[in-house]
């Protein structure tokens, strides 16, 4: 049965908007775990626009399930990760001008650097996942890099405007899951998923984890974080 990894980046986004100490992503993570999330995801960006080093350090000590650190494959971030040692690191592409991660990692085009980062992280006892588009080339390159897992970028599926386009993207995700499992990679999925578009994905065998943030935090503003997390967990676990 798939698990929910709750991304608390947007809690930090609200905090940073005023430069204060509230709301605290550490508190949000604890509420999320109590509500059924089986992992906490944060993205420590190079520009520190939301999650701060302090958040990572405290969450490493307080998260009771699994801490998943999203990060760029840079020497600085690899060094931080090897020092903090979260249970998992997910390597993602990063551009300073983007509002959020816009696409999958180009593993094929940056194989040497990603392999080097993956090796360093795995030597530190960290599970390594690569955030990739659902293409054969990127998934095979992910296996070649030595990664333990892939997180399928579901953004195109989430943004599809027609039924035909949605079916096309869903088919690509289904094939990506099949290939990932065939290659021995653990398969996760995330980006743009909400309480409606996740339903077709929960019926696909082979996905072990959904990483979701924006839609849950958005709903939490209306119904509270505990309820928002529980509702998503119920959808993911439905028979």
Swiss-Prot record:
One of its GO terms (biological process) is pyridoxine biosynthetic process. Pfam families: PdxJ. InterPro entries: Aldolase_TIM (IPR013785), PyrdxlP_synth_PdxJ (IPR004569), Pyridoxine-5'_phos_synth (IPR036130). The record marks 151 as: Transition state stabilizer. 3-amino-2-oxopropyl phosphate binds at residues 7, 18, 192, 213-214. 1-deoxy-D-xylulose 5-phosphate binds at residues 9-10, 45, 50, 100. It catalyses: 3-amino-2-oxopropyl phosphate + 1-deoxy-D-xylulose 5-phosphate = pyridoxine 5'-phosphate + phosphate + 2 H2O + H(+). It is found in: Cytoplasm. PANTHER family: PYRIDOXINE 5'-PHOSPHATE SYNTHASE. HAMAP family: PdxJ. This is Pyridoxine 5'-phosphate synthase. It comes from Trichlorobacter lovleyi (strain ATCC BAA-1151 / DSM 17278 / SZ).
